[in-house]
Amino acid sequence: MTDKVRIYDIAREMGRDSRDVLEVCEQLGIPFKTHSSTISPEQAELVRSKLGAPHIVKPPRPRPKPPSESLPPEPPAEAKVGERPQQKVPGTASAIVGIRRPAPAQQPAPVGEAKTAETLPAAKPSLSRPERVSPEKGSAGGAQLIGPPRRQVTPLVRSSEATQKPETVSQPATPPTPSESAAAKASGSEPSPVAKRPIVLSPPQRATSGTKPPAERPEPPQKAPEPSRPSPSEAPSPSHARVPQPAEEKAPSPPPAQRPRPQLVSAPVRPGTRSPATKEDSVSSGKAGEAPRPQRRMELVGPPTRPVAKPAPPEPDAASPLPERIPGERPSPVLVEAPVRPTPPKVKRKTEEEEDDELQALSRRAARVQAKRKRSRRRGEGDGDGLDLDPMTIISAVKQAELNALKPLARPTAKPPSYRPPAATAAPPARPRPAARLQQQPTSAEAGAADRASGTEPLPEEKVLLLDGSLTVQELAHRLRVAETEIIKTLFFKGVMVTINQVLDESLAESVAKELGYEIRRPKAEPEAKKTEMLDVEDIDHLVSRPPVVTIMGHVDHGKTTLLDAIRDTKVAQGEAGGITQRIGAYHVDVNFEGQKRRIVFLDTPGHQAFTAMRARGARVTDIAVLVVAADDGVQPQTLEAISHARAAQVPIIVAINKIDKPGSQPERIKQQLAEHGLLPEEWGGDTPMVEVSALTRRNLDALLEMILLVADVAELQANPNRPARGTVIEAHLDKARGPVATLLVQNGTLRVGDTLVAGAVLGRVKAMMDDRGQRLQEAGPSSAVQLLGLDEVPAAGDEFQVYTDEKEARRIAQERAEVLRQTRLQQALLSRRVSLGSVSAKAQEGQLKELNLIIKTDVQGSAEAIQTALRDLPQEEVQLRVLLAAPGEITETDVDLAAASDAIILGFNTTLAPGARQAADDKGVDVREYDIIYNLLDDLRAAMEGLLEPEEVEEPLGQAEVRLVIPIGRGAVAGSYVLSGKVQRNALVRVRRRGEVVYEGRLDSLKRFKDDVREVAAGFECGIGIDKFQSWQEGDIIEVYQMVTKRRTLASV
């Protein structure tokens, strides 16, 4: 393998990138795998000849590099050593300048040809190697390298540059050390390149160490006799250095020599004008090459920075055409940070409190100066004892330096913060704070500190607490603008132990707020059925008439669904469990009216009291409310609730008095009852249309439909079909075959297959749509009720949906809403374990409060909502209900696992069990109950809650006896008694009353009739009653006989 040559060795010898050599090998058909592959010497010669340079026999370690264009074949050896002395020799810097300018266009060949393009690709791989070689030898190599560069540079070198660089070269013995140390921090083995350019920066570094104030940059050069003069000029001359160094990268084609110089140049680049976003801008503006941070401090103070400006820098800036070529980023920050690091630790010993106090003192002092100046202007006094000065001038230089040091250290990406007078801004924001703390709301203590620092008194606030429900301790503290510990302490004195995240019920929060002097106000409750406006301003010019949406409302069993069946010629009511509607339905009906075919959309709502939310949802989206009242039953609670929903939604009401065909119906009585609740019939001079109908006999149905269309025409219902659809989710459920299915009511726009929509927090794409009769639709216009497939999850009934043209925006909105929903659920979970002063929390702490965990699975989302609403109405003083899961869909094995883990009961309402769920429930002992009527579900749930209640002992009276004769026996006495009522039993509990007062309570020990012991004596018989512990009988005493029995408690008795 010794006679073979590696591809990357050829690339290094030729000053080319390995990829160039690989391309040549590919062209010549030479097999290879990577740049580390070896080829024979004959193949190597072919490659070298193809690349256009003769082979120079050199071992790979020396890393021969062909110098610039006109050098003879020897330069590779000289190039190695030559890089080191370039710092010393006066002519090298000027020669480098000359080499750089031709370099970008040419690639120098190793022999002597004018090819400098090879240097550019080789610059990156050679950074580390030349740096190691250069520090060891500084002068010998320099003499050798001087010759070749001078020949090329002579036409391009300026006289000023030639004179300045000899001076800098003369210093390498001493100056290189600081520069090398600075560069060594950035790259451990890069001293030689750092020595070249830092030589230029070394005098400024001495100056920074010698003079603490950064503004006195010109002075340090004076300390050093020879180097100090060139150093200030060359402090801007980092730009000078930049020009030669890029040239040096290109002139020495071999990679090893080129990289150190770009890195050296990078150090001057930062002090120069290169980085606009860093604090080093001040150095680039013309000031000596000092560290940027001290300069920033002087800029903050203001006055000292002005004298520091120097006219010298423009010359080097003009001479630096190639600053962008400099790749070295690491050395530059090291050179800048080296002088800065020693200073901050001295000042940073102060704590944040001391910084606050100092800033506040300065702000107050500045405020006093401004106040005095204003008063002097008003009085016309012109004394200039510092009153005309800016508030910053009263700060001594020492204070300014301390204040500057208090500020956070400069970061390379951050802009230098401009100093503002402390009086103008609050003190806390000026201090560096952790980002996490800045995101939090300021505490009351911080707010007070800010007010004091700004010199302004906080305005007196009205101490009012808007209380809208249960709150956590943290939320209550924020609303009251007090510390959380204050709330916890107040509750502790009340005997309540809480943590910051615990939820306080409304009464407890109110008591805490009142104790802290706050007035309690409660927000005005908005009705559930408040209508949402779906039209936008842009729709006004494109409105067309739309069909009316009519909601059928009324009390249970008043014939709502039967009436709708009669209108639609269907038999929906016959298929309903228990003969009652338990879900909201949407239907279309086409009616011939005045020779035109008109469409009406009907929403059928449940009448049971548990389905309040469904009725409110129907009223919110409807245009007309049809109130069905049974003529034989009259106005009932849900009838009144429906009236309130319709009024809240501000929709017109049409009353349909149903069942007029039944005997005993009294339509006039119904009208009288409705008039008492504000619905006055039209024939009585009111504005409420009332139609007497019979659903079974189809009597007056046409009159009802005609009335609906007349009211709709008066309302002038309109929508814009030429826009993305908007509307409301009427109902939703999970179908095991089709997935999430939602019933949508399109209220504006047109919904099409393929649209992307967001319903509440659920994202989806319309895959298919069906109407109420199961026919597929491609689009649905305004006032259309459709079943939609394609949602990711089951949306909540009542959520509004909207179609978005941009899917990314829709996804973002859905994610934001989902996060809000998640927070709401967490709050609800906390509310289930709220703390109160009542008996509930006390019993819970004593372990007397029992919990019943439930998992509710229903056919549709609205049913789950209705069941949860009904559960909240049950008394929960001793048994609390915790709903772990309430969702539509079938009961799965996952639900069974959750129930087994949490000891919960699964309630299935109009749903089925998935395959395997029944077996899993039997194996794990989970109680799964299925219902199709909500009455039965609530009754069983109430019974289960009562079963968890501890049975109570109650007194059951047995009988009464009157003492007629006291019979003394031995030391005691026996009461000869007559049984007045009931019976008297031996060993029963007795209560002896004398003139209405109880004189003894105990147990009846002996009972005799004549001389025989008996177990009991019935009413109307005489007996002898003896009690061992009571002997003081008197005639006329009443003996009450009773027993204690355990009785099952009911929720009504709780």
From Swiss-Prot:
Annotated stretches, region: G3: 604-607
Pro residues bias (residue ranges): 65-76, 221-235, 304-316
Chain residue ranges for the region called G5: 694-696
Domain of life (superkingdom): Bacteria
CDD domains attached to this UniProt entry: IF2_eIF5B (cd01887), IF2_mtIF2_II (cd03702), mtIF2_IVc (cd03692)
Biased composition (Polar residues): 160-169
Record-annotated tr-type G domain positions: 545-718
The keyword Nucleus is assigned to this record: no
G2: annotated segments: 579-583
GO CC annotation, single: cytosol
Residue numbers spanned by region Disordered: 48-390, 409-458
Entry keywords, A to Z: Cytoplasm, GTP-binding, Initiation factor, Nucleotide-binding, Protein biosynthesis
Binding-site residues for GTP, renumbered to this chain: 554-561, 604-608, 658-661
Basic residues: compositionally biased ranges: 365-378
G4: annotated span: 658-661
Residue ranges, compositional bias (Low complexity): 179-193, 421-437
Gene3D superfamilies: 1.10.10.2480, P-loop containing nucleotide triphosphate hydrolases, Translation factors, Translation initiation factor IF- 2, domain 3
Alphabetized InterPro entries for the sequence: EF-G-like_DII, IF2_II, IF2_N, P-loop_NTPase, Small_GTP-bd, T_Tr_GTP-bd_dom, TF_IF2_bacterial-like, TIF_IF2
GO MF annotation: an example: GTP binding
Region of interest called G1, as start-end residue ranges on this chain: 554-561
Entry similarity comment: Belongs to the TRAFAC class translation factor GTPase superfamily. Classic translation factor GTPase family. IF-2 subfamily.
Function in brief: One of the essential components for the initiation of protein synthesis. Protects formylmethionyl-tRNA from spontaneous hydrolysis and promotes its binding to the 30S ribosomal subunits. Also involved in the hydrolysis of GTP during the formation of the 70S ribosomal complex.
Listed HAMAP family: IF_2_B
Protein name per UniProt: Translation initiation factor IF-2
Protein source organism: Synechococcus sp. (strain JA-2-3B'a(2-13))
Gene that specifies this protein: infB
